[in-house]
Amino acid sequence: MPVFRSNALSSVLRAEHMAAGRPAVPLAEDEAYWGEIQRAFDADRTLINLNNGGVSPTPTHVLEAMIRDLRFSNEAPVEHMWSVLEPRIESVRRELAKEFGCDLEEMAITRNASESNETMIFGLDLKRGDEVIVTTQNYPRMLTSWDQRARREGIVVKQIKFTVPPPSDDYIVNQFREAITPRTRVIEITHITNLTGQILPVAKVVAMAREKGIEVFVDGAHAFAHFPFTRDELGCDYYGTSLHKWLLAPIGTGFLYVRRSKQKSLWPLMAAPASMDENVRKYEEIGTHPAANHNAISAALTFHRAIGGERKVARLRYLRDRWAKRLLAESSRVRVLTPLDGKQAGGIALFNVHGIDSAKLQGWLWAKHRIITTPIIHAEFSGIRITPNVYTTLDEVDRFGDTVLEAIARGVNV
């Protein structure tokens, strides 16, 4: 076995000593503390990666834990992987359930949010004519999945719209409420949209829908480990997320939460025996897969807890405000489509520049300056999504701001 010499854990220990119980918001600006966190990553610093929403680098000690298990598996897969490593998924289940605030028998380990959400989408029995409410800002893959079910089974999928940014939580709840009819069976809501980073009022929508006997599926792909919350704060019965985004777990990890009382009526995506009808592990019946990826979730969770959820989101908001408020202050042509006040957003934000095509600006940022961003071209709005993470340096954020101001002053055709 190779000997790994990751400095990630020692960096976290030094950072924790620096924090010493200090409040999260002032600590967000302590570059010595965050410098220790940044040293836990083996990130490519020849570029500036501001698209951590799709997938994020994992700390080196998490990666090394996964590699260690992959090597061990490869020595004798049928014994090492299936008999030794796979049973350790139960420890991962227990710790994830504790973090989310649910029973461990309600926590299924999946490969990503899409797998979790499609289990919900295809798993509930619906009849021709039954209605599902989504929004035009739901994740495209989920909209495609609902559309396939509509084409195949004759259910009706209704898409509602809300302004960007929305004026209030109550406005969003009312948009859902007004779309409900006697045929409505399901609402799918994103916890935080991948387009603008808007955090939606999940708890209020769940409460409203429950009074009417409507199931609510929550797509939490960008929420878990991005900002603190628990299952009971949402009140939801179903929740799907990826863990390779904000938890910084290995690529190809996620979870699906299904309340115990709902498990019997939600079919798994792949077949499971009738004896597993009320066993959350039926959602993990996916055939042969590496144990290394999901076992390393535990190391990522330990890293997340060492930072702390409040500290993390305070830092992410600080980085967001650093570039967004600067651009707003220095150019009247900049518009930020994400709320910057209160707790309606975390580290994700969307902006555009009047007179500059967002797709061209995104391409220019990469081609000329090696800055990775995400173009958002939606039927109702467009812009560039900026998504830093805890390994992002202040210098990288400032260089991004400098570059956008250069584009505003000189254009993107030079």
Where are the regions that the model predicts?
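Pyridoxal 5′-phosphate
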Residues: 2-414
